[in-house]
A protein has these predicted regions:
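Asparagine-centered strand-capping/turn motif at beta-strand->loop junctions
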Residues: 88-90, 226-229
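Short acidic-glycine-tyrosine-enriched beta hairpin
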Residues: 66-81, 204-222
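Structural motif
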Residues: 52, 59-61, 68, 84, ...
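Short strand-connecting beta-turns/loops that link adjacent beta-strands
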Residues: 25-26, 48, 92-93, 164, ...
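Short, conserved beta-strand element in jelly-roll/cupin
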Residues: 31-35, 45-63, 100-102, 169-173, ...
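A short, N-terminal "cap"/entry segment at the start of jelly-roll beta-barrel domains
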Residues: 1-28, 36, 42, 112-166, ...
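A short hydrophobic beta-strand segment most commonly corresponding to one strand
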Residues: 78, 92-109, 216, 230-247
Length: 279
């Protein structure tokens, strides 16, 4: 049985709330809510991993060496390794947002207060990352590459495509079938349900997960998903690392790291992480 957790509360005040939702090798995920003037990070760089931000409410300013991006609601920002960056809440309202680090690279321990092993450094004298590689993508079909676009039935949009992480958006009509049960040998699969509910099939059990649920499936665990509900459902899908998932959806990566369920049933689904995002 997959149980829905609530994550690990790191800090909770009216001005700033930080909850660690996922802390596995392939991904660290933090949900945060911050008032203007709080949650500000200094300019920094990650040498070996990428960072992504999604804004639910309010706005963030993503500062790079040569420009500033305003990240509003329903928008992703993706920062590759070696790119100097910082972010802070902008405007007059609180911001609610999700922070991903892929791979984890010690971020879980970092937010707990142990920074020694985390892959983060002050900006070098000569930065090597090109700030033009930073991606900012609005969701809901507004931006990105639509792989499938049948509004009443199914829309699949690639938002971020990088070695460290692929982020896609799935919008499925009532009763629309998703992926049949399968496994990934060498990478993790994840979902964040945004609207409605998706049914996730994990080994021999099925679980309907509502909006606001984050699910991370480690390598070797059998899983699939459908929209079994009578309403539209929308989610983000993550592959960590990418392994060419976007090309797989385009039909140009037949060797993608995806296999039918093994005869032994795959690995124990107890390692699956399911967390409800805080309001």
């Amino acid at each position: 049985m997959v149980e829905i957790g609530v994550g690990e509360v790191i800090f909770r005040r009216e001005e700033l709330s930080v909850t660690l939702l996922v802390d596995v090798e392939q991904l660290a995920a933090v949900a945060a809510r911050a008032a203007p003037g709080w949650g500000k990070s200094p300019l920094h760089v990650h040498a070996r991993h990428a960072e992504a931000l999604f804004v639910f409410e309010g706005a963030l300013a993503l500062r790079l060496e040569d420009r500033v991006h305003r990240i509003g609601p329903e928008t992703w920002a993706f920062v590759p390794p070696q790119v100097v960056h910082a972010f802070e809440v902008t405007g007059d309202e609180q911001a609610r947002y999700l922070v991903l680090h892929a791979p984890n690279s010690g971020y879980g321990d970092y937010v707990r207060g142990s920074a020694a092993a985390f892959d983060q450094q002050p900006p070098p004298e000569y930065a090597t990352g090109d700030p033009r590689l930073v991606l900012v993508r609005r969701t809901g079909g507004a931006e990105g590459e639509n792989i499938t676009n049948r509004p009443r039935e199914r829309r699949a949009t690639v938002l971020v495509e990088a070695d460290e992480l692929t982020i896609s958006e799935f919008d499925y009509g009532p009763g629309e079938r998703g992926a049949k049960p399968h496994i990934h040998r060498h990478h993790a699969d994840g979902f964040l349900v945004l609207e409605g509910a998706f049914t996730f099939h994990v080994r021999d059990a099925s679980h309907a997960l509502p909006a606001g649920t984050l699910l991370v499936i480690p390598p070797g665990v059998v899983h699939g998903f459908d929209n079994d509900s009578p309403a539209h459902a929308r989610c983000f899908n993550f592959h960590m690392p990418s392994f060419g998932f976007a090309d797989y959806m385009r039909g140009t990566n037949p060797g993608f790291d995806q296999l039918d369920p093994p005869e032994d049933g795959g690995l124990d689904p107890a390692s699956v992480v399911v967390a409800q995002l805080p309001e």
